[in-house]
Amino acid sequence: MSEDLKDSGLTDQSNGSAAQYYFEFRGVNKAFDEHVVLQNVSFKVKRGDTCVIMGRSGVGKSVSLKHIMGFLTADSGRILIDGQDVTNFTERQFEVIRRKVTMVFQSGALFDSLSVAENIAFPLEDQPGLTAEDVDAYVAKLAHTLEVEEVLDKLPSELSTGMKRAVAIARALAQNPEAILYDEPTTMVDPIMAGHMGDLILRLKDAFHKTSIVVTHDTHLAKRLADNVVFLQDGRAQVFGSWAEFESSTDPFLRDFLLQDELIPALDVTL
């Protein structure tokens, strides 16, 4: 484990509760008016594993994450987090869940009026027993780990897309979560930054066993990260126990998805 990760203040989550699976979807259905997005979707994510959810745009990848965070409610089926059924949780109950599970949004979702340092420190505002000096020291450690220390005094509007993502990950880590959800972490960044994001997520996983779900259409990233793969197509989920199993599937929709990803180069080169 690298020294910066050792000193980051993050803790190993491999020895949490007795629940083997941190996330479970059991026959989840979701429709918006007549448009069915999730149809009897079931999958499990083991504690400490990284699950990659793949599929074309609009198939329900991000919708799945929003169900976990309590931003959307399933029409039917069950969702379990750390062995606890959260399907019908209230907003107040989900506030507790969000202290354990954080989400890195595609947009970064940073506060425009706050500096990078203030954005990273935001989840720590209500932490009992932390002095201002404690918060500053912790933010500095996270900034070093995420390699964003050079921009701590800048506003989000002054950052590149890739740097905003790195800051968003730092803010997500500030509350030392048990699990992290990543929504398209490499979209609209160039290959170098995409590789950096993959390195970072992999380091966090290997060092601290954070349970993760990564929504992406980036097969290069997915291949590096995936312990298991969920492929969404027409509202239904196919679950694969490894990337090799996913890649060797003969399903025509899946083969076409992989082929298109190989043939179409990344068009977004904005850092």
What are these regions (language model features)?
Residues N176:
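Conserved catalytic motifs of ABC-family nucleotide-binding domains
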Residues L114-F122:
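Short coil-to-helix segment of the ABC ATPase nucleotide-binding domain corresponding to the Q-loop/switch region
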Residues M69:
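Helix-to-loop junction immediately C-terminal to a conserved catalytic motif
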Residues Q84-D85, A132-E150:
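Conserved ABC ATPase "signature" region
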Residues V86-T102, A132, F246-T250:
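ABC ATPase NBD coupling module
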Residues L155-L159, M163:
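Conserved ABC ATPase signature
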